[in-house]
């Protein structure tokens, strides 16, 4: 729109759009072809397509923090002390059912939470969680963290995208600006994942100074793991720990100009 009054005038523009999609039906064979395999050291972005979710969605584990204590510390407590331990908000790698109750074996011992990997090539690995390890939500409450616990974490598609701008004129002066924006999308911050991994020679984020170091530490940054072994990458699995809001407002350009009088130009 244009506004004019005396020597002043203003011109505004705005645009917006929404791209929404949902996968309602797809041949099972095609679905399997599109979905990448889950690996035991999965730090790669899973390409996954699921019905009733949008194409371009992010999938991974739900991150719930860091285990404060080792399993052995918890297991050595009496049953009453164990219940009090959990009621106080402390965490240890112990399997809980849907009601938050401790899952026990035939001997009455608490079941230890494990990271369990297996695939169609008959490869199988188990890892016993320890104090300082990342806590991933056990979706089906079986005490095993595996591919069945991978869930939808959000869409990379924005709910709204577009731009706006204006041109302001006063006498011979002009101010011109243009912005673009995106609202409601999720991004997977792989730069942050690498900077908090503590398994490479790359520079690390200041956040790793607050990592778990000893039993009882309360922090959101897991312990440092050795780069050797099958589970060196466990604490930086793809999860909502690294999923962030992708909303932004960006200034594309800002111009200030002055239209010199013709007489002045001729003198130059």
Protein language model regions, located:
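Residues that define the transmembrane beta-barrel architecture of outer-membrane proteins
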Residues: 8, 158-162, 247-252
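Transmembrane beta-strands of outer-membrane beta-barrel proteins
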Residues: 10-12, 164, 170, 175-177, ...
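Outer-membrane beta-barrel architecture
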Residues: 1, 13-15, 62, 165-167, ...
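Short coil turns and loop connectors of transmembrane beta-barrels in diderm outer membranes
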Residues: 4-8, 20, 171-172, 262-266
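Outer-membrane beta-barrel domain signature
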Residues: 151-155, 242-245
């Amino acid at each position: 729109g244009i506004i004019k009054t005396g020597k002043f005038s203003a011109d505004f523009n705005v645009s917006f759009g929404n791209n929404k999609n949902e996968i309602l039906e797809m041949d099972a064979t095609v679905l399997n072809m599109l979905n990448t395999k889950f690996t035991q050291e999965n730090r790669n972005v899973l390409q996954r397509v699921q019905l009733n979710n949008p194409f371009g969605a992010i999938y991974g584990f739900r991150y719930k923090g860091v285990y404060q204590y080792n399993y052995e510390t918890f297991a050595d407590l009496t049953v009453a002390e164990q219940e009090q331990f959990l009621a106080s908000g402390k965490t240890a790698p112990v399997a809980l059912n849907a009601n938050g109750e401790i899952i026990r074996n035939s001997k009455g011992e608490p079941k230890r939470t494990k990271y369990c990997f297996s695939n169609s090539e008959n490869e199988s690995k188990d890892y016993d969680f320890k104090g300082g390890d990342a806590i991933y939500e056990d979706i089906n409450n079986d005490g095993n963290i595996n591919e069945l616990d991978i869930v939808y974490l959000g869409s990379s598609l924005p709910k709204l995208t577009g731009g706006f701008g204006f041109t302001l004129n006063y006498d011979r002066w002009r101010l011109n600006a243009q912005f673009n924006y995106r609202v409601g999308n999720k991004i997977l911050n792989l730069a942050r994942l690498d900077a908090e991994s503590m398994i490479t020679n790359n520079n690390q984020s200041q956040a790793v100074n607050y990592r778990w170091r000893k039993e009882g530490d309360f922090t959101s940054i897991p312990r440092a793991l050795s780069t050797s072994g099958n589970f060196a990458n466990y604490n930086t699995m793809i999860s909502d720990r690294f999923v962030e809001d992708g909303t932004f407002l960006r200034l594309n350009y800002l111009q200030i100009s002055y239209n010199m009088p013709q007489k002045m130009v001729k003198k130059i």
